[in-house]
Amino acid sequence: MSKLTKSRKIRLAKATQQNRRVPAWVMIKTKRTVVSHPKRRNWRRSTLKV
């Protein structure tokens, strides 16, 4: 069992916050020209360099 340091925990939390979908109001405002954002990350497919 590995220990999580505070700095690593903060970086993981930041990565989780960045991994959100585009808000619905943005889709409405841009008339669905902006539907997804390119930096979206899947937990199985890609790894984090944390």
From Swiss-Prot:
Keywords: Ribonucleoprotein, Ribosomal protein. GO terms for cellular component: ribonucleoprotein complex; ribosome. The keyword Magnesium does not apply. The keyword Ribosomal protein applies. InterPro entries: Ribosomal_eL39 (IPR000077), Ribosomal_eL39_CS (IPR020083), Ribosomal_eL39_dom_sf (IPR023626). GO terms for molecular function: structural constituent of ribosome. GO terms for biological process: translation. Belongs to the eukaryotic ribosomal protein eL39 family. HAMAP family: Ribosomal_eL39. This is Large ribosomal subunit protein eL39. It comes from Methanocorpusculum labreanum (strain ATCC 43576 / DSM 4855 / Z).
